Amino acid sequence: MKIIIVGLGKVGQTLAFELSKEDNDITVIDNREGVVQDFASQYDIMGVIGNGSSYSTQMEAGIEAADLLIAVTGSDELNLLCCLIAKKAGNCHTIARVRTPEYSSELNFIKEELGLAMVINPEMAAADEIARVLKFPSAIDVDTFSKSRVDLLKFRVLEHSVLDEMRISDITSKTKGNILICAVERGEQLIIPER
């Protein structure tokens, strides 16, 4: 996959490093010449020095053949502009990092109107993850589905706990909330209970 990353801060460098390990063809764009040269030579990737929102800079980076452009500069507006230009110049998928709190309620609108594949707000994602963990502190794992309306939880039932030796039908009837136990794991055995 040919991926262009605009912005070589910590996030951009980490993305470039991790994605290059997966045999992707990575090109980075940043206006800091030394940073681009050092990073590109260290990881054997293509580096372009310039403004990532410039059409000519994106063309030099190979936007016409790119599958994906990820904009992670320090400016939300620059990230969005980079993605808009990439979408028009190369018709590739685009991902923008948007951190400004004022935009958080407008992320879906921004994503749809600009044709972005994804909008990432790292701070909001971290806060959501912390809130999920705090919501179910004894859960081993929490996955959320259906726009946060469904939580899939994994618990370890400890010996002599309230749930130990309790029948599944009793668990669902005695707990508050809408609960469906979809699987029980005992060692290597997975049991799917009948309703």
Task: Tell where the protein language model's regions lie, with residue ranges.
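Cytosolic regulatory regions of ion transport systems
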Residues: 1-195
